[in-house]
Amino acid sequence: MPLYQRIVAIDYGTKRIGVAKSDPLGMFAQPIGTVDRAGLSKLLSPMVEAGEVQLVVVGYPLNRHGEQTAMTEVIDRFIESLRLEFPALPIETINEHCSSKSAMQLLVASGTSRKERKTKGRLDTAAACLLLSDYLEQQK
């Protein structure tokens, strides 16, 4: 088992799943990319089997009042399926309210061109990185 393990963040969407991971020390978020549901299993399985992942953080859709949204039930089912597939892997949630909006603002501020911002998956990956960055900040 590796001395340092990573935290993986997931921004689950109906079309794509944005994925990010922490550095081995758990200080920074790094983008992995976007996958579909089957691709997520293929991505996570080798990392989990190698003992490289200590925790998965899933964006949880709450509105600005902290109440559940229409997507919350979908995320609950997704988390349950992750727990069945990876029973020993701890899974936590983090409020993802405005994560996509914040990710878009970050892409604009970083000088990412409009064409690059519209690239499929770019926003989902950025949102996963923001979720993970927020989670890591909360742990300090």
From Swiss-Prot:
UniProtKB keywords: Cytoplasm, Hydrolase, Nuclease, Ribosome biogenesis
Disulfide bonds: none
Location (main, coarse): cytoplasm
Cellular compartment(s): Cytoplasm
Pfam families: RuvX (PF03652)
One of the record's GO molecular function terms: nuclease activity
Keyword Flavoprotein in record: no
Keyword Oxidoreductase: no
Enzyme Commission number(s) from the entry: 3.1.-.-
Any one of the GO BP annotations: rRNA 5'-end processing
CC annotations in GO: cytosol
Uppermost EC category: hydrolase
Role, per record: Could be a nuclease involved in processing of the 5'-end of pre-16S rRNA.
Homology family: Belongs to the YqgF nuclease family.
PANTHER family named among the record's database cross-references: POLYNUCLEOTIDYL TRANSFERASE, RIBONUCLEASE H-LIKE SUPERFAMILY PROTEIN (PTHR33317:SF4)
Database matches in NCBIfam families: RNAse_H_YqgF
UniProt protein name: Putative pre-16S rRNA nuclease
Organism in which the protein naturally occurs: Chlorobium chlorochromatii (strain CaD3)
Organismal lineage: Bacteria, Pseudomonadati, Chlorobiota, Chlorobiia, Chlorobiales
